[in-house]
Amino acid sequence: MLILTKVNIYMLIIVLWLYGYNFIISESQCPMINDDSFTLKRKYQIDSAESTIKMDKKRTKFQNRAKMVKEINQTIRAAQTHYETLKLGYIKFKRMIRTTTLEDIAPSIPNNQKTYKLFSDISAIGKASRNPSKMVYALLLYMFPNLFGDDHRFIRYRMHPMSKIKHKIFSPFKLNLIRILVEERFYNNECRSNKWRIIGTQVDKMLIAESDKYTIDARYNLKPMYRIKGKSEEDTLFIKQMVEQCVTSQELVEKVLKILFRDLFKSGEYKAYRYDDDVENGFIGLDTLKLNIVHDIVEPCMPVRRPVAKILCKEMVNKYFENPLHIIGKNLQECIDFVSE
């Protein structure tokens, strides 16, 4: 009779484990491993190439998200320094205009007409405001008019998002100016970090309530990043970098147009241009080569067939030249009416 000592038991376990391991990996010892009716194989069958691709996609997605969050955090940290510098400059500017007028100092200010209009507009909104949260919301409408257009991309924006992946944040640098204006109007220029966060939370609730009324139309959706393919690897990388900054295809079109036709928008000559020549209505056709670049960047990102994407892209170009929403100041009365309610 075999006496099972501890040593014998350990040896038996090792032998059984090795035998089981060889049984599993040796197809000649177990022919049914190749049988498709084998339950475990059906349940756990994995194609190695497909698995590798999936893992690569997950890894890339994780890396992109990590990179995005890192960049957002860096921007937020930089914005804090910007806030302190901007506030000092703003207070000095306000002291300066107590002894003179904006008209007197305007010649020494770069882009003085735009600066003068901006200051006049935001001052009017501030004077009409009765509530800090409503003032912030109105200034968001004023400073980010393109986010509140027909594509309703504001749905994806928050001041203090719970998730930096699901929602984007408004430009922290513009938010700094809004914060300074609110502190001047309601808190005697005192820095109120905790109060500002509470106001931001209240404004986010207002944005959520407004978002519930709208959806982003399917024609403005963008493809998932992994499905975007350009004509080359370099093109694909460049397009993805552009798309990372956008919520909708309309926003992508606008971003590309502002880069390619910067001079037209800066000078105001954009009003005379459209996608095609239109002699009857007095419009000049845009540069064909630049328009081809717009199509090459935008169309691969749209979740529709290329012929349809081309038509939609053309419509979005014309729409933007008819009313370029990035130009602020057009909705001043709307903002004043909002804070006055």
Curated annotation (Swiss-Prot):
The chain crosses the membrane at residues 7-25. It is found in: Host cytoplasm; Host nucleus; Membrane. Keywords: Early protein, Host cytoplasm, Host nucleus, Host-virus interaction, Inhibition of host innate immune response by virus, Inhibition of host RLR pathway by virus, Membrane, Repeat, Transmembrane, Transmembrane helix, Viral immunoevasion. Changing R95K: Complete loss of nuclear localization. The keyword Lyase does not apply. It is a single-pass membrane protein. One of its GO terms (molecular function) is DNA binding. Residues 112-222, 233-328 form the BEN domain. Major early protein present in virus factories. The presence of BEN domains suggests a possible role in organization of viral DNA during replication or transcription. Plays an essential role in the inhibition of the cGAS-dependent type I IFN induction in host dendritic cells. Mechanistically, abolishes cGAMP production by triggering host CGAS degradation via a proteasome-dependent mechanism. Interacts with host CGAS; this interaction inhibits CGAS-mediated type I interferon response. This is Protein OPG067. It comes from Vaccinia virus (strain Western Reserve) (VACV). The gene is OPG067.
